[in-house]
């Protein structure tokens, strides 16, 4: 009866390889490698808006979905400010939020966004395949999604995931 232990052992090895092969935090996205969906946003009063043409302006950029009620959005905000301070264009999409709360959030923490719009009903988020906030996309200069990252942008994520995607996006321009 050596066959059952060998079969079990082989299965255990394959399962172990499968578990450690991919990033367990990475969520699949059918959008990567595809053109960004249409930008259909409501104006954020007092802020510059962006549109489809902005995503195809020849410049690599980040698009960040956020909300004032989102604790991880608050946690990632200093990292978005730092990326913006480095000259990386960051475009914000305020997701299903009260305007006053969103405005207070930016007044308190700072505004890292080159331009911003509001997705009040979450309809645009459906087209983008949003899982939840925060969520950040790396977009190349032709408007192609290079990376979709679900979750807060930490310093580790910037170095291991965002910067390599920005470099890849710059190479595809």
Where do the model's predicted regions map?
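N-terminal targeting signals for export/organelle localization
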Residues: 1-42, 173
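Short gly/ser/thr-rich secondary-structure transition/capping motifs
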Residues: 21-23, 42-49, 116-119
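A short beta-strand-turn-helix
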Residues: 39-62
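Short pre-active-site segment immediately N-terminal to redox-active cysteine/selenocysteine motifs
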Residues: 59-61, 66-69, 132
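Hydrophobic beta-strand core positions in alpha/beta domains
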Residues: 62-64, 92, 138
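C-type cytochrome heme c attachment motif
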Residues: 68-75, 135
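Structural microenvironment flanking redox-active thiols in thiol-disulfide oxidoreductases
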Residues: 74-110, 119-126
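Thiol/disulfide oxidoreductase modules built on the thioredoxin-like
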Residues: 107-112, 119-170
């Amino acid at each position: 009866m050596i066959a059952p232990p060998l079969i079990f052992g082989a299965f255990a090895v394959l399962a172990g390889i499968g578990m450690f092969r991919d990033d367990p935090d990475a969520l699949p996205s059918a959008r990567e490698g595809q053109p960004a969906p249409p930008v259909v946003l409501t104006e954020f009063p007092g802020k510059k808006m962006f549109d489809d043409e902005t995503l195809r302006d020849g410049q690599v950029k980040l698009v960040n979905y956020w909300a004032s009620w989102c604790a991880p959005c608050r946690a990632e905000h200093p990292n978005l400010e730092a990326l913006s301070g480095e000259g990386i264009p960051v475009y914000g999409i305020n997701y299903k939020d009260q305007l006053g709360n969103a405005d207070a959030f930016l007044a308190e923490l700072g505004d890292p966004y080159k331009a911003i719009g509001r997705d009040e009903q979450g309809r645009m988020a459906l087209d983008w395949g949003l899982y939840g906030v925060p969520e950040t996309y790396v977009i190349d200069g032709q408007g192609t999604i290079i990376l979709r990252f679900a979750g807060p942008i930490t310093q580790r994520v910037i170095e291991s995931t965002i910067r390599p995607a920005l470099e890849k996006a710059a190479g595809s321009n």
